[in-house]
Amino acid sequence: MQEFKIEGEYIQLIQLLKALNWVEHGAMAQWVVAEGCVKYNGQVDYRKRLKLRPGDVVEFDGMQIKLV
């Protein structure tokens, strides 16, 4: 599992998807979250502005990342 270091207290889910280049743009990030394509700590989550903190794990399209 790869790790991603965040700056500050948290990063929003759609910002993380864009920062990792898992999606091409913000609209696509919002769409994949709304369609239930993203897992947060092992469960599908539909919150686009979900605040991710160190220790959280995000999965999308066979990729997995842990925030540190």
Spans of features found by a protein language model:
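A positively charged, amphipathic N-terminal helix/segment that binds anionic biomolecules
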Residues: 2-3, 57-68
